[in-house]
Regions:
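Glycine/tyrosine- and acidic-biased, solvent-exposed loop/turn segments at the edges of beta-strands
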Residues: 1-96
């Protein structure tokens, strides 16, 4: 697979900068959502997949594993009030 570096604006207004495969985010990149949230990490077929960090526009931060755009696997959520939740995330929620 030959990826190229590029910058694209998605249909929802989000802006992606990084590796592209056939015009789709694939590899390492940065996705800035229209609300100001920012994901930096791995992409497969246009979705966050692998390891990455999402900083929400309101300040909470999730860092860990992703599967098909959802927090799945080992991760850590740090909330703006300083509370930290670490464990195994399943479909976006900390299971243990």
């Amino acid at each position: 697979m030959n990826t190229i570096k590029g910058k694209i604006t998605l249909e929802d207004g989000a802006v992606y900068e990084g590796d592209l495969l056939n015009g789709i985010p694939y590899g390492k990149g940065k996705l800035t959502y229209s609300d100001g949230s920012v994901y930096v990490g791995d992409f497969v077929n246009g979705k966050s997949h692998g390891k990455g960090k999402l900083t929400y526009y309101f300040g909470d931060v999730y860092e860990g594993e992703w599967t098909n755009g959802v927090q799945n696997g080992v991760g850590k959520m740090t909330y703006t009030d300083g509370t930290v939740t670490e464990g195994i995330f399943v479909n976006g929620l900390c299971a243990k």
